[in-house]
């Protein structure tokens, strides 16, 4: 049974988002009564909201995901503005993945890892086993051909994995999860972007101080000035926020 731990749902521009109070609430919801939920986890930030608005294929992919949660602080602020009584906090995708892996290790939940460079994936597997004794039942780096996809789906199914995390970037990872679930729906799928790189130290996140201030985007911009065009696109989201169009 997986119904006793609930979470409210909120609408932002037609997307139905889960409102988790904190990380513990998220874990308890996903592992309700010790039974892991099945479906697809997708992190929602301002950039993803814009992609949904501009690309019908992306909208269809995101709308089909069972569990959409507020990964970006701007989305959290929009939820609180639209729903003043909402008790919702940011649950960063990278942090949720680590917490989920720790819980999976404690519960003995079988995990399949997809995506990333070969050396990064190998390091990720090693650290997960050393740190939390995660039961990794299979893995595949991100360098596979379209012709190999069906065989990979079958490997995931045959492994009996109950958590499948996919680090391929959006929307490629959402397409992969949608297609794999058609063959093997009995798992929790999670799109994790560049999380393996962060976990293994190849990419550094903003210090917690910057994260707490909601300035992680600005920290990344300082390190990568080439991101400025992407940041300018987010002005449209700010307009939605301040004009009540969310």
Curated annotation (Swiss-Prot):
A GO biological-process term: enterobacterial common antigen biosynthetic process
Enzyme Commission code(s) on record: 2.4.1.180
Keywords attached to this entry: Glycosyltransferase, Transferase
The protein's enzyme class: transferase
Reaction it catalyzes: UDP-N-acetyl-alpha-D-mannosaminouronate + N-acetyl-alpha-D-glucosaminyl-di-trans,octa-cis-undecaprenyl diphosphate = beta-D-ManNAcA-(1->4)-alpha-D-GlcNAc-di-trans,octa-cis-undecaprenyl diphosphate + UDP + H(+)
One Gene Ontology molecular-function label: lipopolysaccharide N-acetylmannosaminouronosyltransferase activity
Matches recorded under InterPro entries: UDP-ManNAcA_Trfase_WecG, WecG_TagA_CpsF
Pathway(s) where this gene product acts: Bacterial outer membrane biogenesis; enterobacterial common antigen biosynthesis
A Pfam family this chain is assigned to: Glyco_tran_WecG
Transmembrane segments: none
Alphabetized PANTHER family for the sequence: PTHR34136, UDP-N-ACETYL-D-MANNOSAMINURONIC ACID TRANSFERASE
Homology family: Belongs to the glycosyltransferase 26 family.
Purpose: Catalyzes the synthesis of Und-PP-GlcNAc-ManNAcA (Lipid II), the second lipid-linked intermediate involved in enterobacterial common antigen (ECA) synthesis.
Protein name: UDP-N-acetyl-D-mannosaminuronic acid transferase
Lineage of the organism: Bacteria, Pseudomonadati, Pseudomonadota, Gammaproteobacteria, Enterobacterales
Gene: wecG
């Amino acid at each position: 049974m997986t119904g006793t731990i609930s979470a409210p749902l909120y609408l932002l521009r037609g997307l139905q988002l889960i409102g988790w109070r904190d990380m513990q609430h998220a874990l308890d919801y996903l592992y309700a009564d010790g039974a892991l939920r099945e479906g697809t986890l997708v992190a929602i930030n301002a950039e993803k909201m814009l992609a949904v608005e501009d690309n019908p294929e992306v909208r269809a992919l995101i709308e089909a995901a069972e569990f959409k949660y507020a990964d970006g602080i701007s989305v959290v602020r929009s939820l609180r503005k639209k729903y003043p009584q909402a008790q919702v906090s940011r649950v960063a995708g990278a942090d949720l993945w680590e917490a989920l892996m720790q819980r999976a290790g404690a519960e003995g939940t079988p995990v399949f890892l997809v995506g990333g460079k070969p050396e990064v994936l190998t390091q990720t597997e090693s650290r997960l086993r050393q740190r939390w004794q995660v039961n990794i039942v299979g893995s595949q780096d991100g360098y596979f051909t379209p012709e190999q996809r069906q065989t990979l789906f079958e490997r995931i199914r045959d492994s009996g994995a109950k958590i499948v995390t996919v680090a391929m970037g959006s929307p490629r990872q959402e397409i992969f999860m949608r297609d794999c679930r058609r063959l093997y729906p009995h798992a929790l799928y999670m799109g994790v972007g560049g999380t393996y790189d962060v976990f293994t130290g190849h990419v550094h996140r903003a210090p917690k101080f910057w994260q707490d201030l909601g300035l992680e985007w600005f920290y990344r911009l300082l390190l990568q000035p080439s991101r400025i065009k992407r940041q300018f696109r987010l002005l449209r989201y700010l307009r939605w926020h301040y004009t009540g169009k969310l």
